[in-house]
Amino acid sequence: MGGSWFLVARFWFPVPSQLPSNNQQPKTSNQKPTSGGAKVRRPALNLNHRRRDLVGRVRFFRKNMMLFKRLLLVVQLAVAGVAAPLAARANHVLIPMDNTQKESLKAYGVAFWLLQREVPVDWLLNYRGGSFAFETVSGAENEMAVRGVTFTVISEAQYTGILQEIADPNANMDVMKLEKVPKIAVYTPKGKQPWDDAVTMVLGYAEIPYTQIYDDEVLKGELPKYDWLHLHHEDFTGEYGKFYATYRNAPWYQQQQHDAEATAKRNGFAKVSVMKGTVATKMQEFIAGGGFLFAMCSATDSYDIALAGLGVDMVESMYDGDPADPAAQSKLNFNRCLAFQNFQLERNPFQYEYSNIDMQPNERGLGEQNDYFSLFTYSAKYDPVPTMLCQNHEKTIHGFMGQTTAFRKSLIKSDVVVMGETKQTGEARYVHGTLGKGTWTFYGGHDPEDYQHLVGEEPTDLALHPNSPGYRLILNNILFPAAKKKKQKT
């Protein structure tokens, strides 16, 4: 381009060798001076010179007219080449979340990465599986490439077209602006447990940072520091997962009991069950103050059981040193529960079950080959919360077992939103509700990509399941607090 402008300059301002110079001496007449000192007739030098100068310039212009036309064409093409990208500048990035995405789970990590850098992210609800979009920012394309996330760079006009498609009143789609970086806490003991934790695994895989907390931190009142709290394979009844019958002699079980009793004593509690009930209450206060609680597996039903049984001894002697109250069932207060009501406690201390909230295998009649649950479809424009929590590229999710696998629908409170169910067995797998200024979500099962995860098994390798629809539901919940416009009040 620079060379073209140089040629144009040379054309408009020719060098001295190309044109006659005003400083050239005019040719003199061939007439010799006459004798006697007679005056010689002076030629019209100025007029002739100007004529020659004009004729020279005209000849030069004619001679180089073709060059001029060519240069003009070069300039026009160059200007058009610059103007075209400016008119259709690619200034948005679309991360599709449908079946074209190669790394669905890591895509959530990219969204989190952007929020950490104060880059707003548009969550395009129900558009191509719940895609993400954002304005281009330095380093983003490289970050996505490193993580293997599929993305497309699009123009302003293209993105405007997408937004218009979403805004159509007949389209069940909407845009949710993500602006806030959620502060995530995972409630889990410091020591290693003989089972994996789906949430910590997917957080690690997606490269989303979190803080590990447990009973000490909760009792010290540290929950208000966070926006989102996760509970996984936990027992809030103080019965150590009801593993007594099978694992009471296992070193990990004995260590777990020892650590729990030491923590209770350190915090002024005579029994672990009483401490766990207090911890559950603190978490309920966290929700009511504006927090987001997400629980899986046994942390779902055991949590509500602990709340219902506050002040009631539901625990037998092998767990707390004294017999349970025979009238414990009649003393339960279901009004304190988040999700369940009218359930019956499992009073047998050797039975690996807490209550009849969890559907039993013989009742379900399902196995790995036919265990599926369906996600509900909500109005994106009018029910954005459950819509966000159900974003997925699949609407039918393969089931997976856990200590608590599925919730008996007849025991779920009427104000609870059932987002995923297996209708033929009368069970819910994925439920949601509100309390005060906050919300909670319960998700049945232990590991979405390990149908029957057993104690002592190796953790799941999520690199083998980068587009797991079951794990996507977990990550929907993690991004959900980012859509909260107002600062959390606790």
PLM feature segments, named:
Residues 197, 204, 301, 320, ...:
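Catalytic beta-strand/loop cores that center a nucleophilic Ser/Cys/Thr
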Residues 91-133, 313, 409-490:
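Extracellular ligand-binding/catalytic regions of CAZymes and related secreted enzymes
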Residues 268, 308, 317-319, 326-330:
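Catalytic cores of eukaryotic secretory-pathway lumenal/extracellular enzymes that build
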Residues 86-197, 206, 445, 452, ...:
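Hydrophobic targeting/anchoring helices
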Residues 92-93, 98, 102, 132-142, ...:
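Helical hinge/lid and interdomain linker segments adjacent to catalytic or ligand-binding clefts
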Residues 52-65:
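Short, Lys/Arg-enriched N-terminal segments with co-localized hydrophobic residues
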Residues 69-83:
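Bacterial N-terminal signal peptides
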